[in-house]
């Protein structure tokens, strides 16, 4: 039997406000346990929550960026459950009327047949407070509770069950991560828990309309774990069904050490949480003027910039998507193009995605820390275009020296110091090619007999004779001319 995978994601995005969603306490990461927990966060008697306007504004920014509807009136609700790190005994969230409704995110997915585009529909995004943190490893035989995180503002972003593979889920998560960081509403630090995903996974026979029973994999804080967890869960569910067992709706955890998921508890439904409107908070009202002001202050969005890079610079959709993965990378690329000219936009993209990206990954640094700045890379590209150096020499000899800071990263100075300038004297090059042809009569004979490989051998000999300083295109042209 053929099976179809059905995936929906719920992503908890920690909003980048200086203070918590219902109190004035700092949200800074890394403080000593319980030093950033106010009476509101501790749920002491007599305290009342006050909504953080900045959290609402960030939710509006996100909603506008995905083409969602911003609810003119939304309601906060109490989600009731008991857990040691939830001091109130309930979480303030949104249930029936969330602040952001609908919306779409378009993703680029690498499939077996190449890259394809897919649109993922969003159900909603709602504001809520984070819980505290249980510390299981700090005390022998006991669990500690750190309430510094309690009350930190979250935007929970929920998709429709639109994804059909772990690759699509990861592509969506990466696109969402890129968007919230681009907007500046979240720092995106997955190690610190600023961006974490829950994956709802089920399987059904191909062609069946009814969804299978889903299991929710909680708190996945890396794209690799997201993919591994979904892949394992899918295979587990298929094996269970094919062995005649029934899937039970449950919440599961992923163990990175074993690569397996394991059930944590039977999955609750909404009625188990006994949602009801929070009597301590007035309904949130957002007027059109507020929405319009936020809209006017939005930066150019990744999707808009991607489309512009395709139309203005002739990039492929995939290359444009790669370059706009972060705002800083896109700004770097566009600065290179501004300096070198739009005619070199495609080579500039190749260099940014190739040599620049490779060095950044190798050294574990960001584009802002790259020692080769846009104007310097633009000068190197100009020297390739005007024939001063070949692309190969630029990659092998000039760029590494620029990255190392030689000659203050100036391409012209490095080319001169290392004697890398291509031969510009056509007469001298013709003489060298004549000598190569005379010394390689057998290759000449083989080429004239129809063996194309012999021509490549002659090109190689000519480049060797010029110590790599000849322009390969010019060598090809002269050889073809002389060989008839």
UniProtKB/Swiss-Prot annotation:
Q: Keyword Metal-binding, does the record have it?
A: no
Gene3D superfamilies per UniProt: 1.10.10.410, GatB domain, N-terminal subdomain (1.10.150.380)
Q: Which cysteines are joined by disulfide bonds?
A: none
Query: Sorted alphabetically, which keywords does the UniProt record give?
Result: ATP-binding, Ligase, Nucleotide-binding, Protein biosynthesis
Example GO molecular function: asparaginyl-tRNA synthase (glutamine-hydrolyzing) activity
Subunit structure, per the record?
Heterotrimer of A, B and C subunits.
Function per UniProt: Allows the formation of correctly charged Asn-tRNA(Asn) or Gln-tRNA(Gln) through the transamidation of misacylated Asp-tRNA(Asn) or Glu-tRNA(Gln) in organisms which lack either or both of asparaginyl-tRNA or glutaminyl-tRNA synthetases. The reaction takes place in the presence of glutamine and ATP through an activated phospho-Asp-tRNA(Asn) or phospho-Glu-tRNA(Gln).
Q: What is this protein called?
A: Aspartyl/glutamyl-tRNA(Asn/Gln) amidotransferase subunit B
Q: Which organism is it from?
A: Cupriavidus metallidurans (strain ATCC 43123 / DSM 2839 / NBRC 102507 / CH34) (Ralstonia metallidurans)
């Amino acid at each position: 039997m053929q099976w179809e995978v059905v995936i929906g994601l719920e992503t908890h995005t920690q909003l980048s406000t200086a203070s918590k969603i219902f109190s004035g306490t700092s949200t800074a990461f890394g403080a000593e346990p319980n030093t950033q927990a106010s009476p509101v966060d501790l749920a002491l008697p007599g305290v009342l929550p006050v909504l953080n306007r900045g959290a609402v504004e960030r939710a509006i920014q996100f909603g506008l960026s995905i083409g969602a509807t911003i609810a003119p009136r939304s309601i906060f609700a109490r989600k009731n459950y008991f857990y040691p790190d939830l001091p109130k005994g309930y979480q303030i969230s949104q249930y029936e009327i969330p602040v952001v409704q609908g919306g779409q995110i378009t993703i680029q997915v690498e499939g077996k047949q190449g890259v394809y585009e897919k649109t993922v529909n969003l159900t909603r995004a709602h504001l809520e407070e984070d819980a505290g943190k249980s510390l299981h490893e700090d005390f022998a035989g006991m669990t500690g509770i750190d309430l510094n995180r309690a009350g930190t503002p979250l935007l929970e972003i929920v998709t429709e069950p639109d994804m059909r593979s772990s690759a699509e889920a990861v592509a969506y998560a990466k696109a969402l991560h890129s968007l919230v960081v681009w907007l500046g509403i979240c720092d995106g630090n997955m190690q610190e828990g600023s961006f974490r995903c829950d994956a709802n996974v089920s399987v059904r026979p191909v062609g069946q309309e009814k969804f299978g029973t889903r299991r929710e994999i909680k708190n996945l804080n890396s794209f690799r774990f997201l993919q591994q967890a979904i892949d394992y869960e899918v295979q587990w569910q298929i094996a269970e069904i094919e062995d005649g067992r029934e899937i039970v709706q449950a919440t599961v955890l992923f163990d990175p050490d074993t690569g397996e998921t394991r059930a944590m508890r039977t999955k609750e439904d909404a009625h188990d949480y006994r949602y009801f409107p929070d009597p301590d908070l007035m309904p949130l009202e957002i007027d059109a003027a507020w929405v319009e002001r936020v809209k006017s202050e939005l930066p150019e969005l990744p999707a808009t910039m991607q489309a512009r890079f395709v139309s203005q610079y002739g990039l492929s959709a995939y290359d444009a998507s790669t370059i706009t993965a972060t705002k800083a990378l896109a700004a770097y690329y566009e600065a290179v193009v501004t300096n070198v000219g739009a005619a070199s936009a495609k080579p500039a993209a190749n260099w940014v995605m190739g040599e620049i990206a490779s060095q950044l990954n190798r050294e574990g640094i960001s584009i802002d820390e790259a020692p080769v700045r846009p104007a310097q890379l633009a000068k190197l590209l100009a020297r390739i275009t005007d024939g001063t150096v070949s692309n190969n020499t630029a990659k092998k000899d000039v760029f590494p020296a620029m990255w190392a800071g030689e000659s203050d990263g100036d391409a012209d100075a490095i080319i001169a110091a290392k004697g890398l300038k291509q031969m510009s004297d056509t007469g001298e090059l013709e003489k060298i090619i004549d000598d190569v042809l005379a010394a390689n009569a057998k290759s000449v004979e083989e080429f004239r007999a129809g063996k194309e490989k012999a021509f490549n051998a002659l090109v190689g000999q000519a480049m060797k004779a010029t110590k790599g300083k000849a322009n390969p295109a010019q060598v090809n042209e002269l050889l073809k001319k002389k060989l008839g």
